[in-house]
Amino acid sequence: MIYEKVAEELISSSYTIAFTGAGISTASGIPDFRGPQGLWKKYSPELASIEYFEKDPKNFWGFYSLRMRGLFEAQPNKAHYSLAELEKMGIIKVIITQNIDGLHQKAGSKNVIELHGTMRRSYCVLCLRTYDSLNVLSMIEKGNLPPRCDCGGIIRPDVVLFGEPVKNIYEALSIAYESDLVISIGSSLTVYPANLIPQTVKERGGKLIILNMEETPLDSIADYVVREPVEISLPKILENVRQKILS
């Protein structure tokens, strides 16, 4: 059975990392981006670009505040909790995520690298003062659009917008360079340069496990591919790991 084999790989690995995408959070009510019901089927990606923020911050925040509210209301699902437990057991060393929802930390994960930033924090573009994004939402709900800092600068979410470089990519790639196993969870593996992380592990002689409902460009080089919702597959993997450790 594939879950037993994946569990064996995780246990025998000396340095496993998890690479997560939007698909791990869909069961939490957060739409992915490129799937059949994805966010970019309903909205133009331009709305989440640095160019649009600079050109029209008022309407940028009109879109982003709606998305932000949905992320704050979301709760971790079984996939997040299973990953946090695997980290607690020492199986997963680092979680590298493309997500900005903060659900890994909410589920109890400690060692998380956020490639695209976090929706939970915002900052002033002039003085760089940081804000809890919940407080920024309160400003917007009181009619302050776009939200402004005390210094007069416009506040923006601390996320990577289209047209901006990815955060922490070199740190993430250095970790991938040392890893002998990467488990990719809920990622389309189409977004560059983030998709270099699983590729780097494979190129260094490591193994790649893909958990994703849709096909990915890296399926052909993966050691295992599991086509099942990740909120189902990850708890099964966790249970198999527990059984093998206890036996």
Curated annotation (Swiss-Prot):
It is found in: Cytoplasm. Its main location: cytoplasm. CDD domains: SIR2_Af2. Gene3D superfamilies: SIR2/SIRT2 'Small Domain (3.30.1600.10), TPP-binding domain (3.40.50.1220). PROSITE patterns: SIRTUIN (PS50305). Nicotinamide binds at F33, I100, D101. NAD(+) binds at A22, T26, F33, R34, Q98, I100, D101, H116, S187, S188, N212, V230. It catalyses: N(6)-acetyl-L-lysyl-[protein] + NAD(+) + H2O = 2''-O-acetyl-ADP-D-ribose + nicotinamide + L-lysyl-[protein]. Its EC number is 2.3.1.286. Its cofactor is Zn(2+). It comes from the Archaea. Binds 1 zinc ion per subunit. InterPro entries: DHS-like_NAD/FAD-binding_dom, NAD-dep_sirtuin_deacylases, Sirtuin, Sirtuin_cat_small_dom_sf, Sirtuin_class_U, Ssirtuin_cat_dom. This is NAD-dependent protein deacetylase. It comes from Saccharolobus solfataricus (strain ATCC 35092 / DSM 1617 / JCM 11322 / P2).
